[in-house]
UniProtKB/Swiss-Prot annotation:
The encoding gene: RINT1
Keyword Transcription: no
Location(s), subcellular: Cytoplasm; Endoplasmic reticulum membrane
Database matches in Pfam families: RINT1_TIP1
Native source species: Homo sapiens (Human)
GO cellular component: cytosol; Dsl1/NZR complex; endoplasmic reticulum; endoplasmic reticulum membrane
Disease: Infantile liver failure syndrome 3: A form of infantile liver failure syndrome, a life-threatening disorder of hepatic function that manifests with acute liver failure in the first months or years of life. ILFS3 is an autosomal recessive form characterized by recurrent episodes of acute liver failure often triggered by infection or fever. Affected individuals also have skeletal anomalies of the vertebral bodies and femoral heads.
The keyword Metal-binding appears for this protein: no
Main location: cytoplasm
The protein's role, per its UniProt record: Involved in regulation of membrane traffic between the Golgi and the endoplasmic reticulum (ER); the function is proposed to depend on its association in the NRZ complex which is believed to play a role in SNARE assembly at the ER. May play a role in cell cycle checkpoint control. Essential for telomere length control.
Record's protein name: RAD50-interacting protein 1
Length: 792
């Protein structure tokens, strides 16, 4: 709503009468329009609220007010209201005249739409009837057409079936023609096409066609295979295959200059032709597979020419190592294992030089030597799978078998390059029953060896005691033998095919370490009364050595891989906390951490016991030194030469003897920990029990400093460059007690007047005091008796 002043304000005096009148008329018209709009809105609002008299009263009050002069505006207001009323009436008339027209137009449109809809419905009904009539008329035609289409499709299937048969027969006829003309290479190539056709037909549901196809392939495959195998065996016989003799004598019969090139050329031809039969051979021949419990890796069949080359060796193997032959003895697995290794070695040169080039020439990725080894390996695996159940519960026979198999595996991989991804004897040993038996036997024999090594007379003597450079760790024989045992166990299981099996062996090793630690603890307890004795020190050296070696092993790649495998197992089973899993994953911990922590705790306990023992004896030897008359000793100027206090001799001698004894019996790292622990206790003891318990004159302070700096500290100069840094309490106490009087007085004044820590610390540092607190220095100053008579 516009203010009343704006609506009824009189116009400004015009500069020009004409222009002023025009402006006045325009302003009046605009004011009237605004007033009409606003007034109508106000009136509607007022009437809506049901309070029209109040609205009129308020409007008059606002426009006229109490000013009598403003009554002149009434004519103008009446005129404005009249104009507004007329405009509103015109709007009402306009609206009332337009609405019926719109309604009539809408009704007309609706009527037209209804007519169109009715027309469409009539057309739809007519069309629906026509379509139904057409469908009824066309249905017999559709039925006839469907029958014809079905017949055509059936005929097409018959034609396709006949085409397949024709194609098979054509290939079969071609093979027959090639064989009649002795064209074996083309016959072999055609058989390859037939085998590929067989593979394409595998998805068909035509069982008779598939049977016919397979029977045809089988028929020609047998004929070609028999012929080529016979020819190939004949040519191999001319080469004196197989080579039973050692490699150096294999050239006999092969170096005939006239026939050798022809033989090898024919060998290559037959080899390639046999290789072509590989596809059909794989279709027809089910490869021999050991039971699934052995979890052998999937592998293709040995290529056909190598199979033929392996046949005489397979016959020999089965002849000698099956049945009741004298060579088939459960207690002698090394016989057939050594025989297989010998065969591989005897034929390696021929396979690499004569057969591999043929495979390379035809673009095959097969390695002849490894393929040959794989074929022989299957004989070994079958033999092991047969023999192991027979000797599973005879510890000696089973252990011997495992030893021989591990030696065989080592030579097979290291000498002959047999890949770890191929099927191997370790897969047989990993079978659940066999593996658990292996673990049991391994544990049993390991415990027996531990018993024997600990009961040996030389158990606690180092093998290298007379060789200084080698004997730094001073390792007793039992500890070194035990770690060698663990190392051998690692070598035995590191080639197992699965991480889970390796982790089970790792747990066995950890159990053995814990068992050995317990045995060492038992022996140690028997030697507790002689904690400085040779055997006690040997046990301590053993504990330290085992802990050190395990820490080194933790960084070995093999054990890091096992740690990662263990992490995955623990994560799957939720057997560790998130913190422990995080430590394993970040390599902050290792698989041996639990064992190392237990060994370190045992080492610390044993060292503490030794330190306590020596410290007790040192305290006993220091009784006279504690009672020294420090108050009445002559000053340094009164003595010609300073000498060691006689009462300190027992203390220093006891200390020296024990240090020499333990230096000889403990390894360097242990002895370093020992003397540092001892020095820490000795420093506090002398400071508290001797220095703080006495008063010192000038001579007493000088004598104490001489005894400490010239006699006690040098005892440890063999083990470190600055031994005084390990006796900080004694060293700084001697500094305070031996300050000249002026410096001591000045320091005392500074300490007494120091308001803050900084000034006192600076003063203490200036005289070389870093360890002792301000209160300790004040106590030491009060222990001095050589103060001047100044009241201080």
């Amino acid at each position: 709503m516009l203010p009343a002043g704006e609506i009824g304000a009189s116009p400004a005096a015009p500069c020009c009468s004409e222009s002023g009148d025009e402006r006045k008329n325009l302003e009046e018209k605009s004011d009237i329009n605004v007033t009409v709009l606003i007034g109508s809105k106000q009136v509607s609002e007022g009437t809506d609220n049901g309070d029209l008299p109040s609205y009129v009263s308020a409007f008059i009050e606002k426009e006229v007010g109490n000013d009598l002069k403003s009554l002149k505006k009434l004519d103008k207001l009446i005129e404005q209201r009249t104009v507004s009323k007329m405009q509103l009436e015109e709007q009402v008339l306009t609206i009332s005249s337009e609405i019926p027209k719109r309604i009539r137009s809408a009704l007309k449109n609706a009527e037209e739409s209804k007519q169109f809809l009715n027309q469409f419905l009539e057309q739809e009904t007519h069309l629906f009837s026509a379509i139904n009539s057409h469908l009824l008329t066309a249905q017999p035609w559709m039925d006839d057409l469907g029958t014809m289409i079905s017949q055509i499709e059936e005929i097409e299937r018959h034609l396709a079936y006949l085409k397949w048969i024709s194609q098979i027969e054509e290939l079969s006829d071609n093979i027959q023609q090639y064989l009649m003309t002795n064209n074996v290479p083309e016959a072999a190539s055609t058989l390859v096409s037939m085998a590929e056709l067989d593979i394409k037909l595998q998805e068909s549901s035509c069982t008779h066609l598939l049977g016919f196809m397979r029977a045809t392939v089988k028929f020609w495959h047998k004929i070609l295979k028999d012929k080529l195998t016979s020819d190939f065996e004949e040519i191999l016989a001319q080469l004196h295959w197989p080579f039973i003799a050692p490699p150096q004598s294999q050239t006999v019969g092969l170096s005939r200059p006239a026939s050798a090139p022809e033989i090898y050329s024919y060998l290559e031809t037959l080899f390639c032709q046999l290789l072509k039969l590989q596809t059909s051979d794989e279709l027809l021949t089910e490869p021999k597979q050991l039971p699934e419990k052995y979890s052998l890796p999937a592998s293709p069949s040995v290529i056909l020419p190598i199979q033929v080359m392996l046949t005489p060796l397979q016959k020999r193997f089965r002849y000698h190592f099956r049945g009741n032959r004298q060579t088939n003895v459960l207690s002698k697995p090394e016989w057939y294992l050594a025989q297989v290794l010998m065969w591989i070695g005897n034929h390696t040169e021929f396979l690499d030089e004569k057969i591999q080039p043929i495979l390379d020439k035809v673009g095959s990725l097969v390695n002849a030597r490894l393929e040959f080894s794989r074929g022989l390996m299957m004989l070994v695996l079958e033999k092991l799978a047969t023999d192991i159940p027979c000797l599973l519960y005879d510890d000696n026979l089973f252990c011997h078998l495992v030893d021989e198999v591990l030696l065989f595996e080592r030579e097979l991989h290291s000498v002959h390059g047999y890949p770890g991804t191929f099927a191997s004897c370790m897969h047989i040993l990993s079978e659940e029953t066999c593996f658990q038996r292996w673990l049991t036997v391994e544990r049993k024999f390991a415990l027996q060896k531990m018993d024997s090594m600990l009961s040996s007379e030389a158990a606690w003597v180092s093998q290298y005691k007379d060789i200084t450079d080698v004997d730094e760790m001073k390792v007793p024989d039992c500890a070194e033998t035990f770690m060698t045992l663990l190392l051998v166990i690692t070598d035995r299981y590191k080639n197992l095919p699965t991480a889970s099996r390796k982790l089970q062996f790792l747990e066995l090793q950890k159990d053995l370490v814990d068992d050995f630690r317990i045995r060492l603890t038992q022996v140690m307890k028997e030697e507790t009364r002689a904690s400085l004795g040779f055997r006690y020190c040997a046990i301590l050296n053993a504990v330290n050595y085992i802990s050190t070696v395990l820490a080194d092993w933790a960084d070995n790649v093999f054990f890091l891989q096992l740690q990662q495998a263990a992490l995955e197992v623990f994560a799957e089973n939720n057997t560790l906390s998130k913190l422990q899993l995080g430590q394993l994953a970040s390599m902050e911990s290792s698989v041996f951490d639990d064992m190392i922590n237990l060994l370190e705790r045992l080492k610390h306990d044993m060292l503490t016991r030794q330190v306590d023992h020596v410290f007790r004896e040192v305290k006993d030897a220091a009784k006279l030194y504690k009672k020294e008359r420090w108050l009445s000793l002559p000053s340094q100027s009164e003595q010609a030469v300073m000498s060691l206090s006689s009462s300190a001799c027992p203390l220093l001698l006891t200390l020296r003897d024990h240090l020499l004894q333990l230096e000889q019996q403990l390894c360097f790292s242990l002895f370093k920990i020992f003397w540092q622990m001892l020095v820490e206790k000795l420093d506090v003891y002398i400071y508290q029990e001797i220095i703080l318990a006495n008063h010192f004159n000038e001579g007493g302070a000088a004598q104490l400093q001489f005894d400490m700096t010239r006699n006690l500290f040098p005892l440890f100069s063999h083990y470190c460059k600055r031994p005084e840094n390990y006796f900080k309490h004694i060293k700084e106490a001697c500094i305070v007690l031996n300050l000249n009087v002026g410096s001591a007085l000045l320091l005392k004044d500074v300490l007494q007047s120091a308001s803050g820590q900084l000034p006192a610390t600076a003063a203490l540092n200036e005289v070389g005091i870093y360890k002792l607190a301000q209160q300790d220095v004040e106590i030491l100053l009060n222990l001095r008796t050589n103060w001047p008579n100044t009241g201080k």
